[in-house]
Amino acid sequence: TVLHAGGKFGGGGYKVSGGLHGVGASVVNALSEWLEVEVAKDGNIYQMKFARGHITQEMRIIGTTDQHGTKVTFKPDPEMFDTLEYDYETLHTRMREQAFLNAGLHITITDARIGSQDKPEKERFASMCYEGGIREFVSWYNRHKTPLHEQVIYMAGKKGDQTAEVALQYNDSFTETIVSFANDIHTPEGGMHEEGFKRALTNVLNAYGIKKGYLKNDDKLSGDDVREGLTAIISVKLTDAQFEGQTKAKLGNASMRTLVNAIVSDQLA
């Protein structure tokens, strides 16, 4: 119920966060008919309840546990929304992204809605865990294509509190597929991390071609040339992500251009 609060505020909550203004939980609470929060911490289970943003049950201990984590259950307020339907495929896609981006993380999603209009006849369930992380993400994107080399190329590095990893594989298509993320948030318009990757890839392949005699100095490949048939995943994590706009479609941190460029230049060469 407090604005500008959460993992990225106050320090020490999370190393990285995808939030911008610290209003997510508060907004969901305000737009819910009811919301319940359970937190497993220090051997106890704490519970607190709300209705349309107001406290209906103060925080109390409801049990003990040897686990830790947070459970949030809520019902959207029909007075605020014309429709309360959730799209399973949208949620499934988002959860699958998270599983790929965080190697070894186990995520399950269950759709228990059955028997009503536009609902399946049985419960839908998916369990996702990818030990290979973004390597497997690239393979998933290429699953209906023919790779030109068996192994997915993987590169990673860090500088201070910033980390970056890149995975790529060429296939027999003519299309370019570059999917980038910052703090596990999809950046469909790219940004500095994509710029660094594209620049390094072009420079490395041109340098290799010239060294091996495939290219002349005045006959270099363009960026479009080297990205034809490429599938690549770029994932960066940083403490102070600067997104352009509330939709977080583009990353603006110039330092990530430098870091990704250096990683690809050093490890792909």
Where are these regions (language model features)?
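Mobile ATP-lid/nucleotide-binding loop of the nucleotide-binding subdomain
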Residues: 2
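GHKL-type ATPase core
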Residues: 5-132, 136, 140
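Flexible beta-alpha connector loops of hexameric P-loop NTPases
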Residues: 15, 81, 185-192, 256
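Surface-exposed beta-strand-to-loop junctions
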Residues: 73-75, 179, 262
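Hydrophobic (often cysteine-bearing) scaffold residues that line and stabilize catalytic clefts
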Residues: 87-91, 193-194, 256, 260
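GHKL/Histidine-kinase-like ATPase module
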Residues: 89, 96-98, 104-246
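Flexible helix-coil linker/hinge segments at domain or subdomain boundaries
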Residues: 99, 254-269
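Short, low-complexity, polybasic intrinsically disordered segments
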Residues: 241-257
